[in-house]
């Protein structure tokens, strides 16, 4: 329906004569409210909802009217004062202050008790004390001269044989650890400290003497060397066979005058 047409809708019939005296105050109130809200949003001031209430709503309406009239943007409510310290927290602080010297006295008593226990332990016999430096000197000599002569290597080999029983115990403990291990990697397993000292590795270094290498590692080393030699021999044989085959093919092709290039390249008789 165009405005020029004679037909009027219900809206046009109802509001054809707007009465400004009735709707003017409502329009001004809504206009001032929108202006105040726009100024408040554009000011980027933090809004504190603690003072929200009937009194706050009346103040908000008053501030919106003043801002709509051209006043400055409404200020945010003042921050609330800090809450008073409760007496319970004061009592806890006093207890902690009192408990600090008592804990120090208890720690001193524990240290004295540990010293008394250490003094009460029986002293080691003289023989054990004398044997330890001898073992240390032996280990130092073996470490200093890894590439020594054969007669010097024999006592170190005997010493290693005598300590085989001592080597077996960490292997048993490692087997127990493997038995107790979970079949799947659990979450957070990397944070746990694992005992890697009892797990013996048999990596063979090129500079390591024979008497210091584990027997299984020596067997593996020899087996790998034998396999390498076999592979080298097989490659040499294959290369020699290929060379002989090519030489025979060239000789036969040159000797036969009826062999064409196609027959030489693509025939099965070649």
Curated annotation (Swiss-Prot):
Short motif (ST]-E-Y-X(3)-Y motif 1): ranges: 9-15
GO biological process: cell division; mitotic spindle microtubule depolymerization; regulation of embryonic development; regulation of mitotic spindle assembly
Biased composition (Basic and acidic residues): 92-101, 127-144
Start-end of Polar residues biased regions: 145-156
A single cellular component GO annotation: centriole
Example of a GO MF term: microtubule binding
Biased composition (Acidic residues): 102-118
Short motif ST]-E-Y-X(3)-Y motif 2, span: 260-266
Region annotated Disordered, chain positions: 50-201, 231-255
UniProt xrefs under Pfam families: CCSAP
Keyword terms: Acetylation, Cell cycle, Cell division, Cell projection, Cilium, Cytoplasm, Cytoskeleton, Developmental protein, Microtubule, Mitosis
InterPro entries, per the entry: CSAP
Residues annotated with N-acetylmethionine modification: 1
Recorded superkingdom: Eukaryota
Biased composition (Pro residues): 75-86
Low complexity bias (residue ranges): 53-67
Localization annotation: Cytoplasm, Cytoskeleton, Microtubule organizing center, Centrosome, Centriole; Cytoplasm, Cytoskeleton, Spindle; Cytoplasm, Cytoskeleton; Cytoplasm, Cytoskeleton, Cilium basal body
Subunit structure: Associates with microtubules; the association occurs on polyglutamylated tubulin.
Family note: Belongs to the CCSAP family.
Role, per record: Plays a role in microtubule (MT) stabilization and this stabilization involves the maintenance of NUMA1 at the spindle poles. Colocalizes with polyglutamylated MTs to promote MT stabilization and regulate bipolar spindle formation in mitosis. Binding of CCSAP to centrosomes and the spindle around centrosomes during mitosis inhibits MT depolymerization, thereby stabilizing the mitotic spindle. May play a role in embryonic development. May be required for proper cilia beating.
Name of the protein in question: Centriole, cilia and spindle-associated protein
